[in-house]
């Protein structure tokens, strides 16, 4: 497989994550699992077959350290409290981010993949939620997913889309900015329809911080 084809496939997977994160049941798990599996296989080939040395930037080292610290903290908590080791399942998944860093350093994700897939995902999520609520008569959108998760994921999509909208505004790409703002509104409507309130608590602080950082 050629490098450009492999890079394209990775970009499509990343875009697919934002588009399917709520639309599919456990959509937030499928793409990360596939990417995690690919990254582990690539890391094994990279280190043991080709015997390459990974040159880490300082920021990457701190990020990897934070992942390891997070995992070790959970491990110590389980050992001290004598909890079931099944509790380590979710925290252990964060370790998959380490080989992902290697994978994305060799096959970079294009910035446009993020800039457009996030608002598209926000819009698809919002339109699906509105259809389920007002056309299908669901009490809450995405009933197969816990409503707190739905609300928080939707707010995250709205926040990311808001940052992207500001970016496009600064770049004077106003059509793309409007597109992103529509994604913001639709994602926020999803969160509102879900009935979850947790994500809304920190939203004003996050938005004000973003505006402060982009004040120039």
Question: Which functions belong to the PLM regions below?
Answer:
Residues 1-75, 109, 116, 166-177, ...:
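Transmembrane signal-anchor hairpin modules in multi-pass inner-membrane enzymes, especially those
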Residues 39-40, 96, 109-137, 148-216:
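Alpha-helical transmembrane segments of multi-pass inner-membrane proteins
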Residues 14-18, 135-144:
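Juxtamembrane membrane-water interface segments that cap and precede transmembrane helices
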Residues 25-35, 86-91, 143-159, 195-199:
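Membrane-interface micro-motifs in multi-pass membrane enzymes
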Residues 53-59, 85-88, 108-114, 136-141:
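A cytosolic-side transmembrane-helix exit/cap motif
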Residues 62-72, 82-104, 113, 117, ...:
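Aromatic-anchored transmembrane helix interface
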Residues 74-82, 130-139:
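Juxtamembrane "helix-exit" motif on the non-cytosolic side of transmembrane helices
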């Amino acid at each position: 497989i050629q490098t450009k084809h492999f890079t394209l496939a990775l970009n499509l997977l990343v875009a697919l994550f934002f588009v399917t994160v709520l639309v599919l049941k456990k959509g937030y798990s499928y793409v990360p699992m596939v990417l995690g599996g690919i990254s582990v296989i690539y890391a094994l080939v990279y280190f043991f077959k080709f015997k390459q040395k990974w040159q880490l930037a300082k920021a990457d080292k701190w990020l990897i350290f934070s992942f390891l610290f997070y995992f070790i903290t959970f491990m110590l908590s389980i050992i001290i409290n004598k909890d079931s080791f099944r509790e380590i399942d979710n925290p252990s998944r964060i370790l998959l981010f380490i080989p992902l860093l290697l994978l994305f350093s060799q096959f970079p994700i294009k910035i446009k993949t993020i800039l457009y897939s996030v608002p598209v995902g926000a819009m698809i999520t919002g339109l699906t939620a509105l259809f389920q609520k007002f056309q299908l008569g669901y009490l809450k959108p995405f009933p197969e997913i816990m409503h707190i998760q739905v609300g928080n994921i939707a707010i995250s999509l709205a926040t990311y889309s808001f940052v992207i909208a500001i970016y496009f505004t600064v770049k004077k790409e106003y059509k793309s900015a409007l597109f992103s703002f529509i994604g913001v509104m639709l994602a926020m409507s999803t969160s509102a329809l879900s009935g979850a309130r947790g994500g809304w608590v920190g939203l004003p602080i996050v938005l004000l911080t973003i505006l402060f950082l982009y004040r120039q």
